Amino acid sequence: MINIGIHGSNGRMGTQIRLCLEDDEQAKASAFFDQGSNYEDFFNKCDVIIDFSTPKGCEDLLLYARSNPKPLVIGTTGLDTKQNELMQSASITMPILYATNMSLGVAILKKLSYLASEALRDFDIEILEMHHNKKKDAPSGTAMTLAQNVAKARNLDLEKVRVSGRDGIIGQRSKDEIAVMSLRGGDIVGSHRVGFYNEGEFIELNHSATSRATFAKGAIKCAKWLVSQENGLYDIDDCLGI
């Protein structure tokens, strides 16, 4: 039985992971960390940790783990450059799996969008993401991952070609432009569309999650896989072998 620690256990995702583990025959929720918890006790009770907290919470976790290595599955989004660099350096002494979206379907969407971007170089690319009205960051981490992915397929620097919105008389769309748009409303769990548009035809790749259990189950699958891996930085593609 794999003992899983939940970092950010009182949040939406932490709660969902706990529920999904209740019926799991291979793993159990053995430790819970939220504000006011003790890292030493938390680390001693688990074999692997799943983190869905905040950027600052994730940073604190990584700083402690550097001296107390433990396999980490990180699903927290909105990390800045410093925090990403901290994750990279920490992965030298422990296995870390980082994914902005733990859905297995989104992993396939990422793969398909890369192939489409590479093959359809004359097509314009537009990305649209939709989430609930309580989501704090925009664009979503998943949308940015998808954008980086399609830009990489065309050897483009995303920071130079990304557009976040359009208003007024802005002129003709540039050839390499990649738009990433965000909508917020209601209780939408998560929806992402990567569109490829050309004269006379277009292709749209869509993924929608209808339950947070989708992400929780993906994170648990990653934790089970990661606990037996060597030190290094992984993503969900490594877990799925795609």
Curated annotation (Swiss-Prot):
The keyword Methyltransferase does not apply. The keyword NADP applies. Pfam families: DapB_C (PF05173), DapB_N (PF01113). It is found in: Cytoplasm. One of its GO terms (cellular component) is cytosol. It comes from the Bacteria. Belongs to the DapB family. This is 4-hydroxy-tetrahydrodipicolinate reductase.
